[in-house]
Amino acid sequence: MFYKLAQKVMFQMDPEKAHHFALNSLMATANTPLDCFYAQKIAPSPVEFMGVTFPNPVGLAAGMDKDGECIDGFHAMGFGHIEVGTVTPRPQPGNDLPRLFRLKPAKGIINRMGFNNKGVDNLIANLKAAKSGALIGVNIGKNKDTPVEQGKDDYLICMDKVYEYAAYIAVNISSPNTPGLRSLQYGDLLDDLLGSLKAKQKDLAQKHGKYVPIALKIAPDLSDEEIQKIADSLIKNQFDGAIATNTTLSRDGVSGLMNANETGGLSGKPLNLLSTSVIKKLSSCLNGQIPIIGVGGINSAADAIDKLDAGASMVQIYSGFIYQGPKLIKDIIEACRVRK
Protein backbone atom coordinates (compact mmCIF):
# COMPACT_ATOMS: atom_id res chain seq x y z
CA MET A 1 0.00 0.00 0.00
CA PHE A 2 2.77 2.45 0.96
CA TYR A 3 4.66 1.79 -2.26
CA LYS A 4 1.59 2.41 -4.42
CA LEU A 5 1.11 5.81 -2.76
CA ALA A 6 4.79 6.68 -3.14
CA GLN A 7 4.73 5.51 -6.76
CA LYS A 8 1.73 7.73 -7.49
CA VAL A 9 3.70 10.75 -6.28
CA MET A 10 6.92 9.82 -8.06
CA PHE A 11 5.17 9.08 -11.35
CA GLN A 12 4.06 12.73 -11.40
CA MET A 13 7.73 13.73 -11.35
CA ASP A 14 10.34 13.75 -14.10
CA PRO A 15 11.72 10.16 -14.19
CA GLU A 16 15.30 11.06 -13.31
CA LYS A 17 14.22 13.44 -10.53
CA ALA A 18 11.99 10.68 -9.18
CA HIS A 19 14.96 8.31 -9.27
CA HIS A 20 17.10 10.72 -7.24
CA PHE A 21 14.22 11.37 -4.83
CA ALA A 22 13.84 7.63 -4.21
CA LEU A 23 17.57 7.13 -3.64
CA ASN A 24 17.81 10.14 -1.33
CA SER A 25 14.82 8.84 0.65
CA LEU A 26 16.46 5.44 1.02
CA MET A 27 19.75 7.00 2.13
CA ALA A 28 17.93 9.08 4.75
CA THR A 29 15.88 6.21 6.19
CA ALA A 30 18.13 3.12 5.94
CA ASN A 31 19.12 1.71 9.34
CA THR A 32 16.51 3.90 11.08
CA PRO A 33 13.00 3.09 12.37
CA LEU A 34 11.64 4.62 9.14
CA ASP A 35 12.88 1.67 7.11
CA CYS A 36 9.74 -0.12 8.33
CA PHE A 37 7.95 1.42 5.34
CA TYR A 38 9.86 -0.81 2.91
CA ALA A 39 11.76 -3.47 4.90
CA GLN A 40 10.56 -7.05 4.42
CA LYS A 41 11.27 -10.18 6.42
CA ILE A 42 12.02 -12.92 3.92
CA ALA A 43 12.93 -16.47 4.90
CA PRO A 44 16.25 -17.60 3.41
CA SER A 45 16.07 -19.57 0.17
CA PRO A 46 19.77 -20.08 -0.55
CA VAL A 47 21.19 -20.51 -4.04
CA GLU A 48 24.72 -21.60 -4.93
CA PHE A 49 25.93 -19.59 -7.94
CA MET A 50 29.47 -19.17 -9.29
CA GLY A 51 30.76 -20.70 -6.04
CA VAL A 52 28.98 -18.08 -3.90
CA THR A 53 26.01 -18.86 -1.64
CA PHE A 54 23.33 -16.20 -2.14
CA PRO A 55 20.54 -15.90 0.49
CA ASN A 56 17.87 -15.99 -2.23
CA PRO A 57 17.73 -15.99 -6.05
CA VAL A 58 16.51 -12.39 -6.57
CA GLY A 59 18.95 -9.54 -7.11
CA LEU A 60 18.74 -5.85 -7.94
CA ALA A 61 20.07 -5.25 -11.45
CA ALA A 62 22.80 -2.73 -12.19
CA GLY A 63 21.77 0.85 -12.94
CA MET A 64 19.45 1.48 -10.01
CA ASP A 65 22.18 2.22 -7.47
CA LYS A 66 25.13 3.11 -9.69
CA ASP A 67 27.31 4.52 -6.92
CA GLY A 68 26.39 2.10 -4.14
CA GLU A 69 24.74 4.78 -2.02
CA CYS A 70 21.67 2.77 -0.92
CA ILE A 71 22.99 -0.73 -0.29
CA ASP A 72 21.53 -0.99 3.21
CA GLY A 73 18.10 0.24 2.09
CA PHE A 74 17.84 -2.21 -0.80
CA HIS A 75 19.14 -5.04 1.38
CA ALA A 76 16.35 -4.33 3.88
CA MET A 77 13.81 -4.92 1.10
CA GLY A 78 14.99 -8.51 0.82
CA PHE A 79 17.23 -8.58 -2.24
CA GLY A 80 19.58 -11.57 -2.22
CA HIS A 81 22.26 -9.47 -3.87
CA ILE A 82 22.68 -5.92 -5.15
CA GLU A 83 24.55 -5.19 -8.36
CA VAL A 84 25.96 -1.66 -8.19
CA GLY A 85 27.31 0.32 -11.16
CA THR A 86 27.98 0.52 -13.97
CA VAL A 87 31.09 2.20 -12.59
CA THR A 88 34.01 3.58 -14.61
CA PRO A 89 37.60 4.44 -13.61
CA ARG A 90 36.91 8.19 -13.67
CA PRO A 91 33.70 10.08 -12.81
CA GLN A 92 31.60 11.08 -15.81
CA PRO A 93 28.32 12.97 -16.20
CA GLY A 94 26.73 10.68 -18.78
CA ASN A 95 24.60 11.87 -21.67
CA ASP A 96 22.62 15.11 -21.88
CA LEU A 97 19.22 15.47 -20.19
CA PRO A 98 16.53 14.33 -20.66
CA ARG A 99 17.75 10.74 -20.86
CA LEU A 100 15.17 8.65 -18.99
CA PHE A 101 11.61 8.05 -20.22
CA ARG A 102 8.64 6.05 -18.96
CA LEU A 103 6.36 4.06 -21.26
CA LYS A 104 3.69 3.54 -18.62
CA PRO A 105 1.05 1.72 -20.70
CA ALA A 106 3.63 -0.93 -21.61
CA LYS A 107 5.36 -0.92 -18.20
CA GLY A 108 8.56 -0.05 -20.03
CA ILE A 109 11.43 2.41 -19.63
CA ILE A 110 13.84 3.86 -22.19
CA ASN A 111 17.18 5.18 -20.99
CA ARG A 112 20.25 6.69 -22.58
CA MET A 113 22.04 7.50 -19.32
CA GLY A 114 25.54 6.84 -20.66
CA PHE A 115 27.29 5.35 -17.60
CA ASN A 116 26.82 8.46 -15.43
CA ASN A 117 28.64 7.73 -12.17
CA LYS A 118 30.96 9.28 -9.59
CA GLY A 119 33.88 6.98 -10.37
CA VAL A 120 35.26 3.79 -8.90
CA ASP A 121 37.01 5.40 -5.91
CA ASN A 122 33.75 6.96 -4.72
CA LEU A 123 31.99 3.61 -5.12
CA ILE A 124 34.60 1.86 -2.97
CA ALA A 125 34.09 4.42 -0.18
CA ASN A 126 30.36 3.66 -0.25
CA LEU A 127 30.95 -0.10 -0.23
CA LYS A 128 33.15 0.31 2.85
CA ALA A 129 30.46 2.40 4.58
CA ALA A 130 27.62 -0.10 4.03
CA LYS A 131 26.59 -1.87 7.25
CA SER A 132 24.15 -4.55 6.11
CA GLY A 133 26.55 -7.24 4.94
CA ALA A 134 24.70 -7.48 1.62
CA LEU A 135 26.31 -9.48 -1.18
CA ILE A 136 27.46 -6.96 -3.77
CA GLY A 137 28.06 -7.47 -7.46
CA VAL A 138 30.07 -4.65 -9.03
CA ASN A 139 29.25 -3.87 -12.65
CA ILE A 140 32.25 -2.31 -14.43
CA GLY A 141 32.54 -0.40 -17.71
CA LYS A 142 34.75 1.94 -19.68
CA ASN A 143 34.77 5.74 -19.74
CA LYS A 144 33.11 7.32 -22.76
CA ASP A 145 36.31 9.09 -23.85
CA THR A 146 38.41 5.91 -23.70
CA PRO A 147 38.85 4.52 -27.24
CA VAL A 148 37.26 1.08 -27.70
CA GLU A 149 40.68 -0.36 -28.60
CA GLN A 150 41.94 0.70 -25.14
CA GLY A 151 38.70 -0.14 -23.33
CA LYS A 152 40.29 -3.24 -21.82
CA ASP A 153 42.49 -1.00 -19.66
CA ASP A 154 39.45 0.64 -18.03
CA TYR A 155 37.96 -2.74 -17.14
CA LEU A 156 41.27 -3.89 -15.63
CA ILE A 157 41.57 -0.68 -13.57
CA CYS A 158 38.07 -1.11 -12.15
CA MET A 159 38.54 -4.82 -11.52
CA ASP A 160 41.76 -4.19 -9.62
CA LYS A 161 40.10 -1.60 -7.37
CA VAL A 162 36.78 -3.33 -6.60
CA TYR A 163 38.01 -6.92 -6.32
CA GLU A 164 38.33 -7.19 -2.55
CA TYR A 165 34.90 -5.63 -1.92
CA ALA A 166 32.83 -7.61 -4.44
CA ALA A 167 30.98 -10.93 -4.18
CA TYR A 168 31.28 -11.02 -7.98
CA ILE A 169 32.25 -8.66 -10.80
CA ALA A 170 30.02 -8.05 -13.83
CA VAL A 171 31.65 -6.94 -17.07
CA ASN A 172 29.31 -4.65 -19.00
CA ILE A 173 30.03 -4.61 -22.74
CA SER A 174 26.38 -4.47 -23.76
CA SER A 175 25.01 -1.01 -22.95
CA PRO A 176 23.72 0.65 -26.13
CA ASN A 177 24.44 4.12 -24.72
CA THR A 178 28.25 4.24 -24.88
CA PRO A 179 29.49 4.62 -28.47
CA GLY A 180 31.27 1.52 -29.76
CA LEU A 181 30.87 -0.45 -26.51
CA ARG A 182 28.86 -3.31 -28.00
CA SER A 183 31.66 -3.97 -30.52
CA LEU A 184 33.53 -5.56 -27.59
CA GLN A 185 31.04 -8.46 -27.79
CA TYR A 186 32.57 -9.73 -31.02
CA GLY A 187 35.61 -11.64 -32.26
CA ASP A 188 39.17 -10.85 -31.24
CA LEU A 189 38.17 -7.84 -29.10
CA LEU A 190 35.99 -10.09 -26.93
CA ASP A 191 38.59 -12.85 -26.64
CA ASP A 192 41.30 -10.34 -25.77
CA LEU A 193 39.13 -8.68 -23.10
CA LEU A 194 37.98 -11.92 -21.48
CA GLY A 195 41.47 -13.42 -21.52
CA SER A 196 42.96 -10.29 -19.93
CA LEU A 197 40.28 -10.19 -17.23
CA LYS A 198 40.76 -13.87 -16.44
CA ALA A 199 44.53 -13.38 -16.07
CA LYS A 200 43.90 -10.36 -13.82
CA GLN A 201 41.48 -12.41 -11.73
CA LYS A 202 44.19 -15.03 -11.15
CA ASP A 203 46.67 -12.37 -9.99
CA LEU A 204 44.12 -10.70 -7.71
CA ALA A 205 43.02 -14.01 -6.19
CA GLN A 206 46.62 -14.64 -5.13
CA LYS A 207 47.06 -11.08 -3.87
CA HIS A 208 43.87 -11.00 -1.77
CA GLY A 209 43.63 -14.69 -0.86
CA LYS A 210 40.11 -15.06 -2.21
CA TYR A 211 38.48 -15.94 -5.52
CA VAL A 212 35.95 -13.41 -6.82
CA PRO A 213 33.98 -14.73 -9.82
CA ILE A 214 33.51 -12.67 -12.99
CA ALA A 215 30.43 -12.65 -15.23
CA LEU A 216 29.81 -11.13 -18.66
CA LYS A 217 26.64 -9.08 -19.26
CA ILE A 218 25.38 -9.41 -22.82
CA ALA A 219 22.88 -7.62 -25.05
CA PRO A 220 19.57 -9.08 -26.25
CA ASP A 221 20.13 -7.81 -29.80
CA LEU A 222 22.27 -10.73 -30.95
CA SER A 223 21.94 -13.29 -33.73
CA ASP A 224 22.08 -17.01 -32.94
CA GLU A 225 25.58 -17.10 -34.42
CA GLU A 226 26.72 -14.20 -32.23
CA ILE A 227 25.31 -15.89 -29.11
CA GLN A 228 27.20 -19.07 -30.01
CA LYS A 229 30.46 -17.16 -30.46
CA ILE A 230 30.04 -15.38 -27.12
CA ALA A 231 29.33 -18.73 -25.43
CA ASP A 232 32.43 -20.26 -27.04
CA SER A 233 34.56 -17.35 -25.80
CA LEU A 234 33.13 -17.60 -22.27
CA ILE A 235 33.95 -21.32 -22.14
CA LYS A 236 37.38 -20.88 -23.73
CA ASN A 237 38.34 -18.19 -21.21
CA GLN A 238 36.77 -20.06 -18.27
CA PHE A 239 34.48 -17.21 -17.25
CA ASP A 240 32.42 -17.89 -14.14
CA GLY A 241 29.01 -16.63 -15.27
CA ALA A 242 26.87 -14.76 -17.77
CA ILE A 243 24.19 -12.12 -17.24
CA ALA A 244 21.48 -12.02 -19.90
CA THR A 245 20.34 -9.46 -20.85
CA ASN A 246 20.88 -5.72 -21.01
CA THR A 247 18.37 -3.33 -22.62
CA THR A 248 17.26 -3.61 -26.25
CA LEU A 249 17.32 -1.23 -29.21
CA SER A 250 14.17 -2.92 -30.53
CA ARG A 251 10.83 -1.16 -30.16
CA ASP A 252 8.64 -4.23 -30.66
CA GLY A 253 5.46 -3.92 -28.65
CA VAL A 254 5.78 -0.21 -27.92
CA SER A 255 5.51 1.49 -31.32
CA GLY A 256 3.09 4.40 -31.25
CA LEU A 257 3.40 4.96 -27.50
CA MET A 258 4.55 8.30 -26.12
CA ASN A 259 8.38 8.33 -25.81
CA ALA A 260 8.74 5.12 -27.85
CA ASN A 261 10.85 6.91 -30.46
CA GLU A 262 13.38 8.20 -27.94
CA THR A 263 16.94 6.99 -28.50
CA GLY A 264 18.25 4.52 -25.93
CA GLY A 265 17.80 1.07 -24.49
CA LEU A 266 14.32 -0.27 -23.78
CA SER A 267 13.76 -2.21 -20.55
CA GLY A 268 10.74 -3.43 -18.66
CA LYS A 269 7.89 -5.69 -19.71
CA PRO A 270 8.40 -5.24 -23.50
CA LEU A 271 11.89 -6.76 -23.15
CA ASN A 272 10.74 -9.89 -21.32
CA LEU A 273 10.18 -12.39 -24.15
CA LEU A 274 13.28 -11.31 -26.10
CA SER A 275 15.47 -11.59 -23.01
CA THR A 276 14.07 -15.02 -22.14
CA SER A 277 14.68 -16.29 -25.68
CA VAL A 278 18.33 -15.15 -25.50
CA ILE A 279 18.72 -16.91 -22.14
CA LYS A 280 17.35 -20.12 -23.65
CA LYS A 281 19.75 -19.96 -26.62
CA LEU A 282 22.73 -19.00 -24.48
CA SER A 283 21.97 -21.79 -22.00
CA SER A 284 21.88 -24.30 -24.84
CA CYS A 285 25.21 -23.03 -26.20
CA LEU A 286 26.85 -23.12 -22.77
CA ASN A 287 25.53 -26.65 -22.14
CA GLY A 288 25.55 -26.27 -18.36
CA GLN A 289 29.23 -25.29 -18.21
CA ILE A 290 28.61 -21.68 -17.13
CA PRO A 291 25.61 -20.46 -15.07
CA ILE A 292 23.37 -17.54 -16.06
CA ILE A 293 21.66 -14.69 -14.22
CA GLY A 294 18.40 -13.90 -16.05
CA VAL A 295 17.40 -10.25 -16.26
CA GLY A 296 15.21 -8.20 -18.55
CA GLY A 297 11.50 -7.47 -18.36
CA ILE A 298 10.59 -9.45 -15.26
CA ASN A 299 7.28 -7.97 -14.15
CA SER A 300 5.84 -10.89 -12.18
CA ALA A 301 6.84 -14.11 -10.44
CA ALA A 302 5.73 -16.03 -13.54
CA ASP A 303 8.17 -14.02 -15.69
CA ALA A 304 10.99 -14.94 -13.31
CA ILE A 305 10.08 -18.63 -13.41
CA ASP A 306 10.09 -18.49 -17.22
CA LYS A 307 13.70 -17.26 -17.09
CA LEU A 308 14.68 -20.05 -14.71
CA ASP A 309 12.96 -22.58 -16.97
CA ALA A 310 14.90 -21.12 -19.92
CA GLY A 311 18.18 -21.88 -18.16
CA ALA A 312 18.92 -19.10 -15.66
CA SER A 313 19.97 -19.99 -12.10
CA MET A 314 19.10 -16.62 -10.53
CA VAL A 315 17.25 -13.48 -11.64
CA GLN A 316 17.55 -9.71 -11.29
CA ILE A 317 14.89 -7.01 -11.47
CA TYR A 318 14.93 -3.26 -12.07
CA SER A 319 12.15 -1.79 -14.24
CA GLY A 320 9.63 -4.33 -12.93
CA PHE A 321 10.66 -3.34 -9.41
CA ILE A 322 9.87 0.30 -10.25
CA TYR A 323 6.41 -0.63 -11.53
CA GLN A 324 5.56 -3.31 -8.94
CA GLY A 325 7.50 -2.33 -5.83
CA PRO A 326 9.26 -4.45 -3.17
CA LYS A 327 6.42 -7.00 -3.14
CA LEU A 328 7.80 -8.35 -6.43
CA ILE A 329 10.93 -9.55 -4.60
CA LYS A 330 8.90 -11.59 -2.14
CA ASP A 331 6.56 -12.93 -4.84
CA ILE A 332 9.46 -14.24 -6.93
CA ILE A 333 11.22 -15.84 -3.96
CA GLU A 334 8.01 -17.61 -2.94
CA ALA A 335 7.45 -18.84 -6.50
CA CYS A 336 11.03 -20.12 -6.65
CA ARG A 337 10.54 -21.94 -3.36
CA VAL A 338 7.43 -23.68 -4.72
CA ARG A 339 9.23 -24.50 -7.99
CA LYS A 340 11.94 -26.41 -6.12
UniProtKB/Swiss-Prot annotation:
Catalytic-site annotation from UniProt: S175
Primary enzyme class: oxidoreductase
Biological process, per Gene Ontology: 'de novo' pyrimidine nucleobase biosynthetic process; 'de novo' UMP biosynthetic process
Cysteine disulfide links: none
Keyword match Transferase: no
Predominant location: membrane
Annotated residues for binding of substrate: K66, N111, R112, M113, G114, F115, N172, N177, N246, T247
Annotated protein name in UniProt: Dihydroorotate dehydrogenase (quinone)
Family under the similarity heading: Belongs to the dihydroorotate dehydrogenase family. Type 2 subfamily.
Main function: Catalyzes the conversion of dihydroorotate to orotate with quinone as electron acceptor.
Gene name of the record: pyrD
Organism (species): Shewanella woodyi (strain ATCC 51908 / MS32)
Co-factor note (free text): Binds 1 FMN per subunit.
Subunit structure, as described in the record: Monomer.
Molecular function terms, GO-annotated: dihydroorotate dehydrogenase (quinone) activity
This protein's pathway: Pyrimidine metabolism; UMP biosynthesis via de novo pathway; orotate from (S)-dihydroorotate (quinone route): step 1/1
Keywords, sorted A to Z: Cell membrane, Flavoprotein, FMN, Membrane, Oxidoreductase, Pyrimidine biosynthesis
Subcellular compartments: Cell membrane
Reaction catalyzed: (S)-dihydroorotate + a quinone = orotate + a quinol
PROSITE patterns: DHODEHASE_1 (PS00911), DHODEHASE_2 (PS00912)
CDD domains membership: DHOD_2_like
UniProt cofactor(s): FMN
Binding-site list for FMN: A62, G63, M64, D65, K66, T86, N139, N172, K217, T245, G268, G297, Y318, S319
